[in-house]
Amino acid sequence: MSSARELLRKVKQERLGQKRGLKASSQELKRQKTRDHKSFENLGRDQSRELAVSDFNEKQSTEPPKDTRAVSALPENFFDESIAKNKELIEEEWNDFQNEIGIIEENAVEQEITLQQQQLLAEKDEENEIADNDLEPEVYDILYEEESKLGESRDLIRRLKQKRFETKKNNFSVKESSNLSNNDSDASLDEDTLLWGL
């Protein structure tokens, strides 16, 4: 599988011209420019012009003619689907390619959603700041009182839940410690339900 990937990568490089050195990354171009700039600073203007012209001439003379094409690294019958091995490799590569495209699309959608959410949050923050600036001191007092009441009610709810949990826990432990057998307790429950009409 890795050999098929390598072959497809080589074909892609040949198609894009990277194999022949026609394209270079932006970082490589920046590095080359800085190297050229530093080397030309030390030389006089006339010498730098002469060097630039000679470099240009050398590059043109070393480049292959545009009509010649690079020989493909793939075997001639690689895309022949009648060969089972080739067909499987092509299908695997195609599936991997589609999966990569799907992942890229998902990432793009996620980034777009997060960007929209950040913009909405920024807009809400701006609106809240504007609204907060327009409030009078009495309104701040009212908001503070409401906030403190909410905090007190939250504490009360938490304490009530804690007490309820403790009482349930105690009731459960009392039921476990009773001396009645299961049959006696079931019979007493039946009697109680009959008496109370439940």
From Swiss-Prot:
Basic and acidic residues bias spans: 37-49, 56-69
One GO term describing the cellular component: nucleus
Biased amino acid composition, Acidic residues: 187-198
Record region (Disordered): 15-69, 172-198
Compartmental location: Nucleus
Principal location: nucleus
The entry's keywords: Nucleus
Name recorded for this polypeptide: Uncharacterized protein C645.12c
Low complexity biased stretches: 176-186
UniProt keyword Signal present: no
Superkingdom classification of source: Eukaryota
